[in-house]
């Protein structure tokens, strides 16, 4: 593909928006035939697509909002982007994500364009909303500022008190709802590909919002999966079929969500100091039914046992090696909210059960040192602690 300059991005973005407006005028031209798509059954959808609410910011607006991209307002930095806190003319706190000047290759620009094209058309309380973009003097995305930072920053900051159980449960349920929306509630199926605690942001009420759509993929209704190379994502969250074969579909996100649930329950990081993944540590405990051994010891027993059982059962289904035997996110929500823990329903055939523990965790560990992940892994969108935000805002 030819190298895309900023002017080309502007033109392509304009075409994307025009195309969406045309779809709004003719709802029957949608890419997905909702009447024939099983994925959309029992999912409330508006009869017509919602028009994007983002706007194009001028460079002057975001320059002034961030005080000239002052280092005092820098709240996150990754392999190819930086995030600045800002204050709009209307007094709204915003986050400005900037493609760094050193990241001038085609792939980084493509990631930005992907994020605009994906998140610009989603509307759900558990998915971060795009306020707008700017394509003058660089590439910028503008979001509402998430004052509490990411789940990872709150869960793993040793200087903060442990997150209480009810907040953890609220985060788990809200994130599941947001992911279910991406898979089944959008006009086009969206596979996020990088679900993890540092990509789930929290508002003042601890309502979670899924963020960072740079790796996201549209999945047309007639397709069963994408085949992707090179493999990008985060070590410890990658589903076996993606890690080994590049196969991506909704179940890829389901696996990562299972790891996210285990992280919420245990307070452990997805990969520990010995390079053991969280899901490989948890599987034997789940298999033996010793659920309470999963719980973050910092909670000192202060948790709701029925809720714990539901989250743990959901996690055990999500992290299955065989994607066929993983639930959809709708089914995950049934477990988490309705207590649907019918073990007979989810019992795998004996031969599948034996293959479940054939050694993917060992393979993952062997490949870990040479496995190449996206440079975005170093720091995710606004992955910053409350302390650093409050210090810089004072």
Whereabouts are the PLM-identified features?
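Intrinsically disordered, low-complexity cytosolic regulatory tails
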Residues: 1-52, 304-310, 321-322, 327-394
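Protein kinase glycine-rich loop
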Residues: 72-83
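Glycine-rich ATP phosphate-binding loop
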Residues: 82-103
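Regulatory alphaC helix of protein kinase catalytic domains
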Residues: 112-117
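Short beta-strand micro-motifs within the conserved protein kinase catalytic domain, predominantly
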Residues: 129-139, 147-148
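Conserved catalytic-loop aspartate of Hanks-type protein kinases
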Residues: 253
